[in-house]
Design a protein with these regions (language model features):
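SAM-dependent methyltransferase catalytic region
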Residues: 1-200
């Protein structure tokens, strides 16, 4: 959500200013990704990859390019079909498709998806989060169904799904910090979440 991105940027600026009084003179921009919906027509992905490099076409890449249709609903809970895609992103970013307006539009959307997926790759030494607290009754029907399909062990509450996902975003032996209710430590509905952390 764009407002959350702006608040995150503001918080980072204020923390940096607290540590370094001349920070505002440095013209430094925070590295924040606000996930956006990106959609493709059925034929567009194949046409695009055939034009830029047919060897790149795989079912995994095709699936990935269609995973951000509802990014505003699922957010960073999305698990990209491909991870560690920086090389692929660099390769496609270097492709010139400016001669074809149709391909240029698809190209920009593909780069946006890959950039967003790169942010959601497991590469972080530290993950700190204040996951949203929302039980199943508060979720829209699409999110509730999607959670059951993708986070079946922790579907009872949105914050527990985010705790699992944030753990996946960290490198092995990474540091994690959550602002979360304590209920997951003792309620039976969070037993699988407790097992998840014990087994990590």
């Amino acid at each position: 959500d764009e407002r959350a991105g702006e608040l995150a940027a503001f918080a980072l600026f204020m923390k940096a200013r607290e540590k370094y009084r001349r920070f505002f003179k440095k013209n430094i921009q925070p590295n924040i990704c606000v996930l956006e919906n990106v959609t493709f027509e059925n034929h567009e992905v194949r046409s695009y990859l055939d034009a830029v490099n047919p060897d790149l076409f795989t079912m995994e890449l095709s699936t990935l390019l269609n995973q951000f249709k509802e990014a505003d609903n699922f957010g960073s809970l999305i698990r990209p079909e491909l991870t560690n895609i920086s090389d692929l992103l660099r390769l496609l970013d270097e492709k010139k498709v400016s001669d074809d307006m149709f391909l240029q539009d698809i190209h920009q959307r593909a780069l946006k998806v890959l950039n967003q997926a790169d942010y959601l790759s497991p590469k972080y030494h530290v993950v700190v989060a204040n996951p949203p607290y929302m039980g199943g009754k508060g979720m829209n029907s699409r999110l509730g169904t999607w959670l059951k399909d993708n986070y079946s062990d922790v579907k009872s509450d949105l914050f527990s799904a985010f705790m699992v996902r944030n753990t996946e975003l960290s490198l092995q032996k990474g540091q994690l910090g959550f602002m979360s209710p304590f209920v997951w430590m003792f309620l039976s509905s969070y037993k699988k979440l407790r097992k998840f952390f014990i087994n990590k």
